[in-house]
Amino acid sequence: MIPDKYARYRPEANFIKRYMDEKCAAESSDYDPNSNVSSKNLATLASESGKRGRIYTSRLMMHDMLAAMYGEEEADSYINNLETHRVYCHDETGQIPQIYCASITMYPFLLHGLKGLGGTSDAPKTLQSFAGGFVNLVFAASAQVLGAIATPEFLAYMNYFLVKEYGEDYYLKPDTQAELFGRKRTIDNVITDTFAQVVYSVNQPAAARGNQAVFWNISYFDEPYFRGLFEGFAFPDGTVMTDLWESLWWLQVRFMKWFNQERLRKIITFPVETFSLLNDGKTAVDQRALKHIAEMYAEGHSFFTYTSDSVDSLSSCCFAPDTLFSIWDQHNTLLVGAAARLYQMLEQEQDFRVRVLLGEEVVPATFIRLPGRQMYFITIDIAPNARHMYEVTDNHLFPTRRGDIQAKELVEGDEVQYWDPENRVYSYRPVSEVIESANTYDYVYCLEVDAGCEPYFMLPSGVITHNCRLKNNIVENQFTYSLGAGGIATGSKRVMTININRLVQECGGDMAKAKASLDDLTAHLHRYLKAYNAMVKDAQAKHMIPLYDAGFVSPEKQYLTVGINGLVEAAEYLGIPVGDNKGYSEFTDLILDTIHRRNVADAEPGVMFNTEYVPAESLGVKNAKWDKADGLSVPRACYNSYFFAVEDPRTTVLDKIRLHGNRYIRNLDGGSACHINLEEHLTARQYELLILNAIHEGCSYFTFNVPNTICSDCGHISKHKLEKCPKCGSENLDYATRIIGYLTRVSKWSAERKNEYDRRYFGGQEYEDQAES
């Protein structure tokens, strides 16, 4: 008989046998199946077989940290909430304490290559070295996180190298002859070959990701969004990024069209694309971009659109031009004066690097100028007879006793952090007045404190203010919008999700009791997330997170995320019709407002919470299974990932947009993606009208999904959902669509997700009829 020390591993041995017998990798996984694993082999098995041990190790280390920070009772509650499935911790199978996802800035790569991530490659000097180095960057960065990596600057940096090699007007002469590896090629050939090199390389299996492709996201920008995000940014040789806008616009269009056509040759999953579109509340500011987006949807391309009425997700915390600043320039000269005047002085020197005070510490920063926006007057009582009034942008963040609060959300009586020079301590001073300003400015000004420093600086009065993050996404509703919706150097450190359906049913449908229970559970979740954050900070201090050390990601700009799942199912349990109605609106608002208020109350300097309607590719299935096993009401085998029931034919296209609009998501500060499944593509004009409708409703993040058809016999791919191959006549077909956030073959999905796909309602005819009328 085999000794017990070996026999106790029998479950692992059985798992290996079972895994090899299953049809596909997603169906074989016991822990976190996902359709991004396109093949099943010993490499994917090696990744799967150790996951149970990593989960237990993760829970043990979290228990230890929680016990040290909050006591044994809190630590025990963590294990209990996980094991009773009230709470789910995403990617527990990863190496603790890896961060969850990141939208990286590529500037350190431009300066130092991959040396900051432990590589040997120098900074890229040519287009080809950029392309090769970029692929390695994506793999190296992805190895440091549990989930997705976004590189919003990818095309802007590629454009820079194209300009260096072929001139600023290269986009006007794409058919001009050029050389690539000694071959005569056109400039356009070089560009599309580079696209192919990067895209096909990144879609290969990665050893550090369990032999699956990395989750890679990129961004496109309209002109005002781009200028708002990159105003003042210069490449190392002094080239101003915004001066290259027209060539970048051409390159963005070229990539989208190339990628759309390439997907007729292969079903390519990554990158997940997001087009950032600025609106004025009624329409797109950049009409060229609006029409291009609509045309690409009509041509069958699959991408997300993110629309906002400001670039506040990407820049924040600015002051009026006459605000008094005190700084030291690079010559160690103390400069005191109005922000606009100081900026002009630095502009003459062409050096915006400065130093600024934070208490008694001097910290490095960069002086920044950004386009003007809505302003507010904030009056702070420094002393009994000393009041200071500041004119700041509406999204300016003030560190208060209740966390970092935007100017437009400050209220009389809030207390703002202040440096007391006499006693040499930090204290707080009350806000006495908050007034919306009627002033308009071409530009507003602030300082961006260097990565690695606390994100604050001090005004001459002693008031502490949050610094400007030129490439930030601090406040608006963003899909892990921290990822791929425009934000740079951001992301999420950890995501833990509440099962709303279970919580409501455990309270017997009593919503007063459910609200109190949700508030209490969210408070616990915050302590769990803070414990994980402490582990991340400890790892950072020991230089275990090179993404932080090298400046690719700013830890102070990463969220601790509270996820939700089972919202639709909870409403159904309560007998509330899931749709655009008063009862459902009040229910969703109660849930999201409760979490949002707790997020605000528990925030503190260096700790930001947000709430996300998580995609839940595997969690939607798990929660349904766990709840059903415990005798709870479970209406479907996979919980929804949207504010509507995905199979409901009564929910129109316009309903879906409204259900993901301001009326429902105003307190969902971490984002949700509205997936609109269509039977067939619409016209460009119809898509344009839908985008305008999304702007009107405040639906900020959305995409349209029409299944692609793949012939399993001849390999032909169509952008349409067909019943027979138009090339060979075969009915042996596969389909490709978004399982949640990314495009894959349905045949690669888990059995439960395949069943969920079969139930999806692919509508759109009702909208076509409305549009025609």
Say what each PLM segment does:
Residues 319-468, 644-728, 733, 737-739, ...:
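Autoprocessing domains of the Hint superfamily
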Residues 2-318, 468-556, 577, 581-735:
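Conserved catalytic cores of very large enzyme subunits
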